[in-house]
């Protein structure tokens, strides 16, 4: 191409057929901090595990409105929740502490901020050792709050 030449491209008129994620299917939430999957145990403990075959990492994300989700295990039906001290826990009864604001960040990871404590910017997080991180110790820029939703089954 010589200097001063102009390259033109044809207008794209056909629609793109990009694969759209099926949000009805169960997901695994993979944490960027240490490579853990978010796990909600039957007794209410929330932590991370690297075992992809663990029964308690398969999660169902349900949107209540745009950007607001409930997160629960498919195995036990325990909902993810955050209490007034920022501690993550699992509960069988959904309440206002079970609502999270889901945001797709610029790096293509998702963050989940407690709706009830949104003014305090408390996020779901997993520490490098796999333990849950208190919401009061989380903030933007931490790897601990970055989650990648992955399909639970490779279909």
UniProtKB/Swiss-Prot annotation:
UniProt keyword annotations, A-Z: Angiogenesis, Cytoplasm, Developmental protein, Differentiation, Growth factor, Heparin-binding, Mitogen, Nucleus, Secreted
Coiled coil, from the record: none
Keyword Nucleotidyltransferase appears in the UniProt entry: no
Record localization: Secreted; Cytoplasm; Cytoplasm, Cell cortex; Cytoplasm, Cytosol
SUPFAM superfamilies in the record: Cytokine
A cellular-component GO term for this protein: cytosol
Family matches, as Pfam families: FGF
Single GO biological process annotation from the record: mesonephric epithelium development
InterPro entries: Fibroblast_GF_fam, IL1/FGF
Chain spans, region Heparin-binding: 127-143
Domain of life: Eukaryota
Molecular function, one GO term: integrin binding
Family: Belongs to the heparin-binding growth factors family.
PANTHER family: FIBROBLAST GROWTH FACTOR
Described function: Plays an important role in the regulation of cell survival, cell division, angiogenesis, cell differentiation and cell migration. Functions as a potent mitogen in vitro. Acts as a ligand for FGFR1 and integrins. Binds to FGFR1 in the presence of heparin leading to FGFR1 dimerization and activation via sequential autophosphorylation on tyrosine residues which act as docking sites for interacting proteins, leading to the activation of several signaling cascades. Binds to integrins.
Protein known as: Fibroblast growth factor 1
Natural source organism: Xenopus laevis (African clawed frog)
């Amino acid at each position: 191409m010589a200097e001063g030449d102009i390259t033109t491209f044809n207008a794209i008129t056909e629609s793109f057929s990009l694969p759209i994620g099926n949000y009805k299917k169960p997901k695994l939430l993979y944490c960027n901090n240490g490579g853990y999957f978010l796990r909600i145990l039957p007794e209410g403990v929330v932590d991370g595990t690297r075992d992809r075959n663990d029964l308690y990492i398969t999660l169902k994300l349900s949107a209540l409105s745009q950007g607001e989700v409930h997160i629960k295990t498919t195995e036990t039906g325990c909902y993810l929740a955050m209490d007034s001290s920022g501690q993550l826990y699992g509960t069988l009864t959904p309440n206002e502490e079970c609502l999270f604001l889901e945001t797709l960040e610029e790096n293509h990871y998702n963050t989940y901020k407690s709706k009830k404590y949104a003014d305090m910017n408390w996020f779901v997080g997993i520490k490098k050792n796999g333990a849950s991180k208190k919401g009061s110790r989380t903030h933007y820029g931490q790897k601990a709050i970055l989650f990648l939703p992955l399909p639970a089954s490779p279909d």
